[in-house]
Each structure stands twice: as C-alpha cells, then as structure tokens.
C-alpha cells in the first residue's frame, strides 16, 4: 500500500491502517524474525474452528502447556483495537495450544484458558498463489471464488496458516485499499516496515481493478471491491486463512 490512510474499524472508532502493502512504489526494509515458541504450517481438515479472544490487557504465551514462565506476552488488543485473537489447535487441561499472531509466521504456543473467551467460526479462506485465486467456504459450501492480485517477486505473499485479526472500513471505494481491508495474523518476510506500518499482511480491495490477476503487491492479497465488501461483512475475527 502506498500510504497511511484514515480507516474505520467496523466495530469501533477511527484508526489508521498500516498493513504491508499491495500498491507499487514504496520502499520497505527487511530484518530477522523474532524468536517464538514454535511454528505450524499446515491447516487441519475441519469445518469449524475454535478461536480464543483475549479478555484482559494481555495474554501470556508459554512454550509448553505445563510451563510456569511465559516466553511471550501478547497485548489484549490488536493494533487496530480488536480483542486479540488466537487460533486454537489443541488443548490440555486448562491450557490451549494456539497459533499466535506476529513474527515469525506460524508461531505457536500455549495460553491459559482463563485469559480468553472461546468462540467458533465456520468460514475459512483459501488463497492459491499459483492460480491467483481466493475461495471463501462455509463448511463444505463455496461462498465465493475470485481472481486476486498477489505479491510481486521481490515482495511475495507469505504462505502458511493465518487468521483474521482486524476488519477495517476505509469509507472510500476509490481508496488504494478499496472500501475495506482485512488484517491478517501474518507478516511480510521482506518488509519489516511499510507506509507507517510494521509489514502486516492483509486482504483488501483496490482502486486499480486492472491489477487483479497480477503479481504486483508488496505482500497483500488484492481482490475486487465487491469481493472485499462481501468478505469484510461476512467473516469474523479469527476466521482461518490458508495461503499456499
């Protein structure tokens, strides 16, 4: 994306969008990934996903279920003010094995059930970079499928298992991001900062519809504006997104 722009959180007030971009012409910087408890790359075969949402100011993350000293503290809200989400992979007693938002992509750890509220989502998004398609499913049903723009060769869209962290409205279909942007839990491997943001990737609309189907972004997935409108008003925070 070219610049920081005013946006509206779909359930809160005005903030600023700074996810890693999908328009050309801006510079970013690379850097090493931070250390984290573990990684996961593949999605389980299931139609309903359990999501843990933070209930307090922060969530302690542990390397193992029985550990007493956390290795990471995750803020209770995302950059854009949404209650922090974690994708639940497994559970053991009072602990939950989760996919953690942030670098490096695919990081996992254990959190305490007492620190979160559990929810379920039945939608999932799949992005096929080779075919340049995005598919939204609800259970076994395909809700929509569309052609997308993906990351350019020097800033490819990262692959892996992610989830929705933020749902943002720009208020302008002619904006660089189109009318909506969806923040994801993943980050660009090439850009540690971009347009005032920290290299977070997302799915958003565009004011350059001719770019759809091309490899032209700085890592985000760019979709037609009618599609991003459907996505942003359909999928909740925590919805799993698999990019391959």
Where is each model-derived feature located?
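Beta-loop motif signature
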Residues: 38-87
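Bacterial signal peptide processing site
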Residues: 23-26
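Exported/periplasmic cell-wall-interacting domains
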Residues: 38-39, 115-124, 152, 161, ...
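SH3/SH3-like beta-barrel superfamily modules
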Residues: 78-114
